[in-house]
């Protein structure tokens, strides 16, 4: 099975207007990613406010994205839930709609054991025939995969990757030494992409690439061509942007940044709130200093 989980994957925001999906803005956002040749887009993940979507909205979001993309780039759907039955329904619907793969985190809040985490993903694996990326986000889930559980899950034929949002930079080295050769490990943290890939990572699921996909793509291309100096120069230039985009809970800052650049409304669903005035100013200043334009 072809592994789509590699390179630059944009964790896409979900645009809203008047408390409904803004499909016109979605088209602008998706076409911006296609224009700059990202390797894939992730729909309805944490950055996409997936927990605020109804099942009908989830379906409409995926269906519209598939139509816009028209097979130009792979689409990965988020299928995280602390209800295994509901997560299976998301995975089954993703398959039906025609996305190219899906990502899921360990069930949040309920604090399953490692065996429970394994059984959850085994159930998702059985629910469809799509490739799967594990999503390690312990600050969101409250639990995480152990290295042993990742190894067990990697033996299931369609579990092909791990998106790691943790802070343990030894982890990709440890995992790389035990899992199958075609199992990919990507970081979900913009600020550590170079360090992570130096330790065995093969890509990057990025928040910043919602607004600077061209620069993120250039960074990764330089890294893959062994132009470490060039990649580091770009990374250092982007560091203030990474900081600004996480000055408040993701996706609050990136939603405002996208709005400031004309991609969408600055509408975010409760219990999240829009960016504070100080956060807005910080975001505006870095966008101006980097001359970011859409």
UniProtKB/Swiss-Prot annotation:
Site feature Part of a proton relay during catalysis: at which residues? 46, 109
Tell me the disulfide pairings in this chain: none
So where's the catalytic machinery, residue-wise?
Answer: 135, 163
Which top-rank group of organisms is this from? Bacteria
> Molecular function terms in GO for this entry?
(R,S)-4-hydroxy-2-oxoglutarate aldolase activity; 4-hydroxy-tetrahydrodipicolinate synthase activity
- Signal listed as a keyword: no
Q: Where in the cell is it found?
A: Cytoplasm
> Its catalytic activity?
L-aspartate 4-semialdehyde + pyruvate = (2S,4S)-4-hydroxy-2,3,4,5-tetrahydrodipicolinate + H2O + H(+)
Q: Which InterPro entries match?
A: Aldolase_TIM (IPR013785), DapA (IPR005263), DapA-like (IPR002220), Schiff_base-form_aldolases_AS (IPR020625), Schiff_base-form_aldolases_CS (IPR020624)
What are the boundaries of the signal sequence? none
**One GO process term, biological-process aspect:** diaminopimelate biosynthetic process
**Per UniProt, where does pyruvate bind?**
47, 205
Listed A to Z, the keywords are: Amino-acid biosynthesis, Cytoplasm, Diaminopimelate biosynthesis, Lyase, Lysine biosynthesis, Schiff base
Q: Which SUPFAM superfamilies match?
A: Aldolase
Top-rank EC class of the record's enzyme: lyase
Q: In which pathway does it act?
A: Amino-acid biosynthesis; L-lysine biosynthesis via DAP pathway; (S)-tetrahydrodipicolinate from L-aspartate: step 3/4
Q: What is its EC number?
A: 4.3.3.7
The UniProt subunit note reads as follows: Homotetramer; dimer of dimers.
Q: What does this protein do?
A: Catalyzes the condensation of (S)-aspartate-beta-semialdehyde [(S)-ASA] and pyruvate to 4-hydroxy-tetrahydrodipicolinate (HTPA).
Q: Which family does it belong to?
A: Belongs to the DapA family.
Q: What protein does this entry describe?
A: 4-hydroxy-tetrahydrodipicolinate synthase
Q: Which organism is it from?
A: Rickettsia rickettsii (strain Sheila Smith)
């Amino acid at each position: 099975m072809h592994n789509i989980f590699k390179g630059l994957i944009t964790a896409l925001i979900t645009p809203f207007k008047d408390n409904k999906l803004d499909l016109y803005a979605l088209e602008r956002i998706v076409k911006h990613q296609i224009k700059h040749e990202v390797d894939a887009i992730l729909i309805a993940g944490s950055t996409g406010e997936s927990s605020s979507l109804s099942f009908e909205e989830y379906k409409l979001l995926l269906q519209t994205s598939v139509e816009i993309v028209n097979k130009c780039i792979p689409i990965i759907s988020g299928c995280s839930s602390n209800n295994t039955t509901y997560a299976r329904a998301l995975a089954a619907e993703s398959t039906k709609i025609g996305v190219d793969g899906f990502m899921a985190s360990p069930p949040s809040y309920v604090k399953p054991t490692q065996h429970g985490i394994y059984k959850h993903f085994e159930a998702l694996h059985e629910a469809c025939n799509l490739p799967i990326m594990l999503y390690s986000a312990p600050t969101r889930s409250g639990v995480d995969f152990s290295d042993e559980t990742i190894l067990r899950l990697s033996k299931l034929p369609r579990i092909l990757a791990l998106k790691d949002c943790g802070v343990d930079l030894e982890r990709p080295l440890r995992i790389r030494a035990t899992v199958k050769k075609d199992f990919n490990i990507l970081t979900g943290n913009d600020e550590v992409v170079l360090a992570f890939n130096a330790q065995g990572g093969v890509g990057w699921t990025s928040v910043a690439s919602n607004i600077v996909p061209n620069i993120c793509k250039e960074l990764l291309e330089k890294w893959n061509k062994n132009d470490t100096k060039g990649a580091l120069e770009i990374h250092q230039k982007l560091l203030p942007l990474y900081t600004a985009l996480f000055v408040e809970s993701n996706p609050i800052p990136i939603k405002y940044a996208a709005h400031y650049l004309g991609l969408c409304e600055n509408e975010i669903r409760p219990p999240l709130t829009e960016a504070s005035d100080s956060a807005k100013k910080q975001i505006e200043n870095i966008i101006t200093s980097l001359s970011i334009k859409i």
